[in-house]
A protein has these predicted regions:
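N-terminal flexible segment immediately upstream of the FAD-binding catalytic core
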Residues: 1-67, 83-112, 259-267, 307-331, ...
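General beta-strand structural signal in soluble alpha/beta enzymes
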Residues: 20-24, 55-56, 76-80, 98-100, ...
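Short cationic amphipathic helices and targeting signals
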Residues: 51-56, 114, 222-227, 271-289, ...
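Short, conserved charged micro-motifs
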Residues: 61-64, 124, 232-237, 284-291, ...
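FAD-binding subdomain of flavoenzyme oxidoreductases
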Residues: 105-107, 122-123, 127-246
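A conserved active-site cap/scaffold subdomain adjacent to cofactor or substrate pockets
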Residues: 228-230, 243, 247-250, 258-303
Length: 450
């Protein structure tokens, strides 16, 4: 969708020399993310595109663009690296894509804390902080390409969540600076619990221009593959390792057969028909970790030392939603779900779902910390047939007590929230009174407007 009646030349004159992209091929590319993982979203979002892309390099330039967009009532969709999976950065109403990738500085690093610009890539932040003994607490499998602003705006957790929980947990985001889209745009600072007003809001509640993020101790992480002959043994190994508080770990990713067969680069380490655990464990914990592997009947088939972490394959790039990416590279009919199972050391519900669905819903678990307990989240691979069948699978999971964060919707509240966040809606009314920021994504705003 574009805005044919707007005088774009006048708009461009109002923002001066800030970089603008008008080439249609580039604009269409920068209007998309990985929405096509979903056969439901693919037809809904395929034709959505911005009118142009603007790339500011500073907060001052963001203010200039904000002023121009408010004056012309132009929709604004904020973009980091476009690595989201359900249309978070796809413009539904045309307008401007505000690409913040040029705002990529690390302003300062202190013990346990860093101040960064939104376009800073996660791996680039670690490159600055790790020599000082610190690292970002968690990151998605798109670690090398994703930006911190995009992760905060559209993500929820990832590698590191087994220790630190999810992004919205108190303490995982310290402060943000935000530019508003009022008649006179201003800069406001949110600290402490106030940050939840923009955390995981798809950029609907202001333009983040700076973030203070807590850091964790930087450990030497070994990457390990452990294989099992039985899936439930692999899943129990994941639970026991997660519950072993004295063992320091960053990633516990469990994959039922045939998922490991989709990992082309890892095939030398994955025997045919095996079930696999892809892991990151601190090197000081390896001795007792190996004893646990032996107790549970696993076989270590691959190990990469922390000293080689930057070389070659990263195991993290086969976990979380990279699992879906690799699987779809071999079978594009596959899609996925996002499910949170209740804490249960016996994993009875997981076993039931594994046996009930068989290969139609292939079990992929990612362990994370929630309310001081280690729980299995799942990004199951689904053999898609019809939208009705997909909905029936979701309904069955929910009826049996699992929580499904539906990845087949671009509406904020219809995915992982399930309820309208009235505080976020009230905040949007203050900072974006015309509803210009990523319009169409927040149900609470749409219902308020009607």
């Amino acid at each position: 969708m574009t805005i044919p009646t707007l005088n774009w030349d006048a708009f461009l004159a109002s923002i001066g020399n800030i970089e603008v992209i008008r080439d249609r091929t580039q604009v269409e590319k920068l209007s998309k993310d990985y929405y096509y993982f979903s056969p439901i979203l693919q037809p809904q979002l395929a034709d959505k595109t911005a009118d142009l892309v603007v790339r500011p390099t500073s907060e001052t330039e963001v203010l200039t663009v904000a002023q121009a967009c408010v004056a012309a009532k132009v929709p604004v969709t904020i973009r980091g690296a476009g690595t989201g999976n359900y249309g978070q950065c796809i413009p539904l109403a045309g307008g401007v894509i505000l690409d913040l990738s040029r705002m990529n500085g690390v302003k300062w690093v202190r013990p346990g804390m860093a101040c960064v610009e939104p376009g800073a890539k996660l791996a680039a932040i670690d490159k600055v902080t790790r020599p000082q003994g610190w690292e970002i607490r968690m990151y998605p499998s798109t670690y090398r390409t994703a930006t911190i602003g995009g992760f905060i705006g559209g993500g929820s957790g990832g590698v590191g969540s087994i220790t630190y929980g999810q992004l919205r947990d108190r303490g995982n985001l310290q402060a943000v600076r935000v530019v508003t889209l009022e008649d006179e745009p201003r800069i406001i600072e949110l600290r402490g619990d106030e940050v939840q007003q923009v955390n995981h809001a798809y950029g609907t509640n202001g333009i983040i221009t700076e973030l203070e993020i807590p850091l964790g101790p930087a450990y030497p992480w070994a990457e390990v593959i452990v294989t099992f002959d039985d899936f439930m043994t692999a899943a129990r190994f994941g639970q026991v390792l997660s519950d072993s508080d004295g063992l320091i770990k960053k990633l516990i990713s469990i994959h039922a057969a045939p998922i490991p067969s989709y990992f082309a680069a890892l095939q030398p380490y994955l025997p045919e028909g095996c079930h696999a655990a892809l892991l990151m464990v601190a090197e000081p914990s390896l001795e007792l970790f190996e004893a646990l592997v032996q107790e549970l009947g696993g076989t270590i088939t691959y190990r990469k030392a922390a000293a080689d972490a930057g070389k070659g394959t990263m195991l993290a790039e086969f976990t979380w939603n990279h699992t879906t990416l690799h699987a779809r590279n071999m079978d594009s009919s596959l899609t996925y779900l996002q499910t949170l199972f209740p804490y249960d050391p016996e994993l009875k519900l997981i076993q039931h779902m594994y046996e009930h669905f068989g290969d139609e819903v292939m079990m992929h678990l990612e362990y994370l910390r929630m309310n001081s307990m280690a729980v299995p989240a799942a990004l199951q691979l689904v053999r898609f047939t019809t939208a009705e069948r997909l909905q029936a699978i979701i309904r069955y999971l929910e009826e049996k007590g699992a929580f499904v964060a539906n990845p087949h919707t671009y509406i904020l509240e219809d995915g992982g929230r399930k309820v309208i966040d009235t505080a976020q809606v009230a905040f949007k009314a203050k900072v974006d009174p015309y509803g210009l920021l990523n319009p169409g994504k927040m149900r609470g705003w749409l219902e308020r407007s009607t």
